[in-house]
């Protein structure tokens, strides 16, 4: 199976509500989305509200493996929030990530065709 799962614990200077945090995650657009790079996922992050998601078998291929799935967002006693993140280690992490970097470098003018 492919898939990297991360348990993430976060603090904020000003703690947002859970709903505000979910909205920010779902609406995030980085340079790849703004530049509409060919390999970039349309929506980089998907939030899954089910208690048992994300799961590798069900969610690793989100946006053809180039997106990130986040779920199980909860308030935490030591941190503001905790959640589980999932990405595809081969597509997003290696091969697809390298292609996306090359597309970004080309879009920014660092790489030109001869």
Where are these regions (language model features)?
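C-terminal substrate-binding/catalytic lobe of Rossmann-fold NAD(P)-dependent oxidoreductases
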Residues: 1-82
């Amino acid at each position: 199976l492919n898939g990297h799962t991360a348990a993430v614990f976060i603090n904020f200077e000003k703690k947002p509500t859970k709903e505000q945090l979910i909205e920010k995650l779902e609406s995030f657009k980085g340079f790849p989305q703004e530049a509409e790079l060919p390999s970039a996922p349309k929506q980089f992050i998907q939030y899954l509200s089910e208690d048992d998601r994300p799961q590798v078998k069900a969610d690793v291929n989100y946006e053809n493996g180039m997106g990130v799935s986040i779920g199980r967002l909860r308030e935490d006693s030591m941190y503001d929030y905790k959640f589980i993140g999932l990405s595809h280690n081969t597509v997003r992490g290696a091969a697809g990530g390298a292609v996306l970097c090359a597309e970004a470098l080309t879009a920014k003018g660092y790489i030109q065709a001869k």
